[in-house]
Regions:
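Short, well-formed alpha-helical segments that are part of the catalytic scaffolds
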Residues: 1-7
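Hydrophobic targeting segments
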Residues: 5, 13-17
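Hydrophobic/aromatic residues located in beta-strands of well-ordered beta-sheets
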Residues: 13-14, 64, 91, 160, ...
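A conserved acidic beta->alpha catalytic loop
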Residues: 18-26, 71
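Hydrophobic residues within well-ordered alpha-helices
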Residues: 29, 85, 163-165
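Acceptor/aglycone-binding surface of glycosyltransferases and processive sugar-polymer synthases
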Residues: 35-58, 65, 74-154, 181-202, ...
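Catalytic donor-sugar/metal-binding loop of nucleotide-sugar-dependent glycosyltransferases
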Residues: 126-127, 148-152, 161-179
């Protein structure tokens, strides 16, 4: 995966966030030429993302391209995310549901996706078809928006997109190719689906009265985070 990213985005700096994996992920990623940020134990998807964002902030990067490492996200699509950022978009969201045949998923996943797509679209004012997509490009403004003490530790999906919009950032979807997962397990499975639905719905319903997290500036959060 790392070499495919390097081939399709020459000159890009690759960071792998190893969320406490018990295997040789970190060593293999380094051998492939990536920088590795390793958690001492599994801290959750949201925390892994936040660690990567903080590292990008500390490094002074103006853009971040975010993708999963389970084979779903096609590195050939990275240039499309970059092109959308070039147009002035703050969050370029790769959607598997625009103009392509989406990979197979469970009925519960499809129903949940449509429901939260409807809610996110209503909040943002533009159609969002894939609110759970982790295939994204972020501008510097978007990076500063997610580096905060209130970033979700578990499932940062539709709620984060809505927060971006409320902060005046431009969110746009673009069609991307996604594949069947070749490794690992979906976060949206079993009892986790019920928890995800409950947590996400509650978060979105409370959005009108939720106060911004005031604690520390983005620079301070980035400097003091893993």
């Amino acid at each position: 995966m790392i070499r495919a990213v390097q081939e399709n985005a020459p000159g890009i700096d690759v960071l792998v966030v190893d969320d406490g994996s018990p295997d040789s992920t970190a060593a293999e990623a380094r051998a492939a030429g990536a920088r590795v940020l390793r958690h001492p134990f599994n801290m959750g998807y949201g925390t892994a993302l936040h660690s990567g964002y903080c590292a990008a902030m500390r490094g002074g990067y103006d853009r971040v391209l975010q993708m999963d490492a389970d084979g779903q996200h096609d590195p050939k699509m990275l240039r499309h995310l970059v092109a959308e950022l070039d147009r002035g978009t703050d969050i370029a969201l790769g959607s598997r549901y625009i103009g392509r045949q989406a990979p197979r998923s469970s009925l519960a996943r499809r129903v949940g996706t449509r429901f939260f797509s409807w809610i996110a679209s209503g909040w943002i004012g533009t159609r969002i078809t894939d609110p759970t997509s982790g295939f994204q490009g972020l501008s510097r403004r978007a990076l500063e928006s997610v580096v905060n003490d209130g970033f979700p530790e578990d499932y940062p999906d539709a709620d984060v997109l809505v927060q971006h919009h409320l902060r005046g950032l431009v969110v746009r979807e673009i069609p991307v190719l996604m594949h069947e997962r070749i490794g690992g397990l979906s976060m949206h499975r079993g009892a986790r689906i019920a928890y995800y639905g409950y947590k996400m719905l509650l978060t979105l319903l409370l959005m009108p009265i939720r106060r911004p997290t005031p604690l520390r500036s983005a620079d301070t959060v980035a400097r003091t985070s893993a």
